[in-house]
């Protein structure tokens, strides 16, 4: 009977140790994921800055993510080039205005 209790105690100890190692690995993976998200957030393109080379890299605004808005520019040489900047689309501006107005009225 004593041998069975020793074996059971040993198994419980091994299982708890291995599960705690797994939890530590999960916590480390979550930490790395959060650090990667923070790095991505730091690398986003601010509002009103050029996004021609990275059209999906605009930062978030107050409520919505800024969109890369492009226009065709004609240079003095007559060449047409596309220039893009991160901005807030008109329908997002209207929604932000309504929400801001609602916050002022209803506190």
From Swiss-Prot:
Pfam families: Toxin_35 (PF10530). It comes from the Eukaryota. Expressed by the venom gland. Residues 21-41 form a propeptide. It is found in: Secreted. Disulfide bonds join 44-59, 51-68, 58-86, 70-84. Its main location: secreted. InterPro entries: Spider_toxin_CSTX_knottin (IPR019553). The keyword Signal applies. One of its GO terms (molecular function) is toxin activity. Residues 1-20 form the signal peptide. One of its GO terms (cellular component) is extracellular region. The keyword Plastid does not apply. Keywords: Disulfide bond, Knottin, Secreted, Signal, Toxin. Belongs to the neurotoxin 19 (CSTX) family. 04 (U1-Lctx) subfamily. The presence of a 'disulfide through disulfide knot' structurally defines this protein as a knottin. This is U1-lycotoxin-Ls1m. It comes from Lycosa singoriensis.
């Amino acid at each position: 009977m004593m041998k069975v209790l020793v074996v059971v105690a040993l198994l419980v100890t091994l299982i708890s140790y291995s599960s705690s190692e797994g939890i530590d690995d999960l916590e480390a993976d979550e930490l790395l994921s959060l650090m990667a998200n923070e790095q991505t957030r730091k690398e986003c393109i601010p509002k009103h800055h050029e996004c021609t080379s990275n059209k999906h890299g605009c930062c978030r605004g107050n409520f919505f993510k800024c969109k890369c808005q492009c226009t065709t520019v004609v240079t003095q040489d007559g060449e047409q080039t596309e220039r893009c900047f991160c901005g807030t689309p008109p329908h997002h501006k209207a929604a932000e205005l309504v929400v801001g107005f609602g916050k002022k009225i209803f506190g």
